[in-house]
Amino acid sequence: MMTYIVFILSTVFVVSFVSFSSKPSPIYGGFGLIVAGGTGCGIVLNFGGSFLGLMVFLIYLGGMLVVFGYTTAMATEPYPEAWTSNKAVLAMFITGVLAELLTACYILKEDEVEVVFKFNGAGDWVIYDTGDSGFFSEEAMGIAALYSYGTWLVVVTGWSLLIGVLVIMEVTRGN
């Protein structure tokens, strides 16, 4: 059951990015990013990263939602274009969705799904020692992995958010 939930969330995630990349109006582009952020957090939550999912949800959808609202207010159109108003955009959107479905069907045809990477050094994880036995805390492992193995991910995420804010400020600055 969890595999199907992750599959559905992944499909919604990719379709929302397809809708963002073929945005005819800033309103729908911001909506596509908001849906992508929410479903991405749902995927992270399904894999047990409740702290990371909550952190991304609060930072991304809390902070960037203000920027999306501001840019939408600055770039409102009396008659915004929808995906169906331009036939080329609609055709590209449908082509992207069909490509995603065909790729998903091809992947699901295989019998097993393999993990892309493996962690071999269990000594790097945070272990809580309670006398005779120790146990791993999922939250502490996630934070430790984020800042030890995923240092580049934190740097790229911070840099992307900074560049995104600067681009949005430049676009909405006007003449």
Curated annotation (Swiss-Prot):
Q: Which residues cross the membrane?
A: 1-21, 25-45, 47-67, 88-108, 149-169
Task: Note whether Chaperone occurs among the keywords.
Answer: no
Q: How does it sit in the membrane?
A: Multi-pass membrane protein
Q: Pfam families from the xrefs? A: Oxidored_q3
Give the UniProt record's GO annotations in the biological process aspect. Answer: mitochondrial electron transport, NADH to ubiquinone; mitochondrial respiratory chain complex I assembly
Annotated localization: Mitochondrion inner membrane
> What reaction(s) does this enzyme catalyze?
a ubiquinone + NADH + 5 H(+)(in) = a ubiquinol + NAD(+) + 4 H(+)(out)
Q: Which GO terms describe its molecular function?
A: NADH dehydrogenase (ubiquinone) activity
Q: What class of enzyme is it?
A: translocase
Describe the family membership recorded for this protein in Swiss-Prot or TrEMBL. Answer: Belongs to the complex I subunit 6 family.
Q: Which PANTHER family match?
A: NADH UBIQUINONE OXIDOREDUCTASE SUBUNIT ND6, NADH-UBIQUINONE OXIDOREDUCTASE CHAIN 6
Spell out the protein name for this chain: NADH-ubiquinone oxidoreductase chain 6
